[in-house]
C-alpha cells in the first residue's frame, strides 16, 4: 500500500455507532476558535430520531491541551490510520459538535491500483464512558 488518504467526498453510507472513530472534514467554514481541517472524531451520539443524517462527535487530536482540564481525556493507546502513531491522542470534549454524515468517512488506505481498504476503529467501552463524563463536566461548569 502506497498512499494514505483519510477522507473522501462520499458521505458515510450508514448510521455510525457510539464509540466508532471516523474522519470528519471541518474544512468548509470556521470562525474564531472553531475546529478546522480533517481530523479523527469519536461518535458519542447518533439517534434514529434525527432522521437527518446527523450525529454528535468529539474531535480527537495529537496536540496535548495546555493546560489539561477535566474535559480532556487522554487516549495514549489509540492509533488511527493516517495519524502520527507516536503521538498520544486526546479527546477534546469541549469541542463537541453535531455534524452531517456528509462530513464523515471511515479512515482508509489507498493501494497502488487505486482501490481503498477501509480501516474500522472503535473505542473501548471504558474510554467512551470517560469521554461522556468529560462532556458532562464541560457542559455543567
Model segments located where?
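C-terminal terminal-subdomain/extension
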Residues: 78-141
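Short, structured beta-strand/loop micro-motifs enriched in basic residues and often containing a Trp
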Residues: 1-6
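A broadly conserved detector of short glycine/acidic/proline-rich loop/turn motifs that flank catalytic sites
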Residues: 28, 61, 95-97
Amino acid at each position: 500500500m502506497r498512499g494514505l488518504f483519510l477522507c473522501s467526498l462520499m458521505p458515510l453510507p450508514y448510521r455510525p455507532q457510539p464509540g466508532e472513530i471516523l474522519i470528519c472534514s471541518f474544512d468548509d467554514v470556521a470562525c474564531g476558535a472553531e475546529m478546522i481541517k480533517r481530523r479523527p472524531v469519536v461518535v458519542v451520539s447518533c439517534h434514529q430520531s434525527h432522521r437527518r443524517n446527523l450525529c454528535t462527535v468529539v474531535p480527537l487530536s495529537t496536540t496535548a491541551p495546555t493546560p489539561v482540564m477535566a474535559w480532556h481525556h487522554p487516549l495514549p493507546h489509540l492509533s488511527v490510520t493516517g495519524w502520527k502513531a507516536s503521538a498520544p491522542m486526546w479527546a477534546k470534549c469541549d469541542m463537541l459538535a453535531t455534524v452531517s454524515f456528509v462530513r464523515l468517512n471511515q479512515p482508509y488506505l489507498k493501494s497502488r491500483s487505486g482501490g481503498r481498504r477501509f480501516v474500522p476503529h472503535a473505542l473501548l467501552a471504558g474510554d467512551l464512558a470517560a469521554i461522556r463524563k468529560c462532556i458532562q463536566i464541560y457542559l455543567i461548569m
